[in-house]
């Protein structure tokens, strides 16, 4: 999310807060390189998440884990659908109305889905910890209902948090080239935007602590299991359990860099504490780490495949059916060559 305090004077210059110095910035990276990178994510994410959604809607919601994964794939698909608007807007290929749409709707939706994904990764982490410590416990109907209610509550909370950001982005642009979404926000819209920024930071850091604590406990439990079964026939099962660490890998690759880069970047926008070169570096770091948050939509399918047995079995069954169907069709088309040979 962009901080209201910053003031960009044109597409290639930006003013350093608290000074009259204009800091030139080369936007070729953000107008060419990042649109290309987002295009790759869009096609890869659309294919993998469409397939994941198709599979998940064939699987019963028989555990909290599957319920949380289903919500995650919906969130990822919504995020992916915002990419084309960002690509066209950043590449300066759309009209001013497109930039207004991005600021008012798709950019808000992007962050809305990001923090939903972060929240569900936190819940999935808790679920995996409970599965590690109590592997034979099954989900009761009351637990499943609780997971569904919690999922609805997360969506409702984030929607109510994000909706004012859409409504309060209601100023008419004075210039066709809108360099910052904050120029379109009302006075209260800027205040609400800042409040939402703080709340989203809290959401991230809460889930960051959940991931750190749960994986510390999971590591401890897996080590105890290793010591107990060392040298026994259960060793292969322990190696399978290591797959659970894919969640923390995705969380740290996608979300941690952005939220650490965001702190000095926000400071550079609101206070004159960095020189021009440092400001530009922080800007590019912020844009790079923001792309990593988008990468989450392409990495989550690996979580589904490695950690969800029902998903993996359904996918393999689908692939086998497709392969056998293709072979059968090929056989029917080819037939027996002797039948086509004239006497």
Curated annotation (Swiss-Prot):
Extracellular side: 1-33, 89-103, 169-191, 266-284
Bilayer topology: Multi-pass membrane protein
Transmembrane keyword on record: yes
Protein name listed in UniProt: P2Y purinoceptor 12
BP GO annotations: adenylate cyclase-inhibiting G protein-coupled receptor signaling pathway; adenylate cyclase-modulating G protein-coupled receptor signaling pathway; calcium ion transmembrane transport; calcium-mediated signaling; cell projection organization; cellular response to ATP; cerebral cortex radial glia-guided migration; establishment of localization in cell
Family to which this protein belongs: Belongs to the G-protein coupled receptor 1 family.
Species this chain originates from: Rattus norvegicus (Rat)
UniProt xrefs under InterPro entries: GPCR_Rhodpsn, GPCR_Rhodpsn_7TM, P2Y12_rcpt
Gene from which this protein is expressed: P2ry12
Disulfide bridge positions per record: 23-276, 103-181
Residue intervals on the Cytoplasmic side: 57-67, 125-148, 214-239, 305-343
Domain text: The transmembrane domain is composed of seven transmembrane helices; most of these are not strictly perpendicular to the plane of the membrane, but are tilted and/or kinked. Agonist binding promotes a conformation change in the extracellular loops that leads to an inward movement of the transmembrane helices. Antagonists can bind to an overlapping site, but block the inward movement of the transmembrane helices.
Molecular functions (GO terms): G protein-coupled adenosine receptor activity; G protein-coupled ADP receptor activity; G protein-coupled purinergic nucleotide receptor activity
Region (Disordered): 324-343
Domain of life: Eukaryota
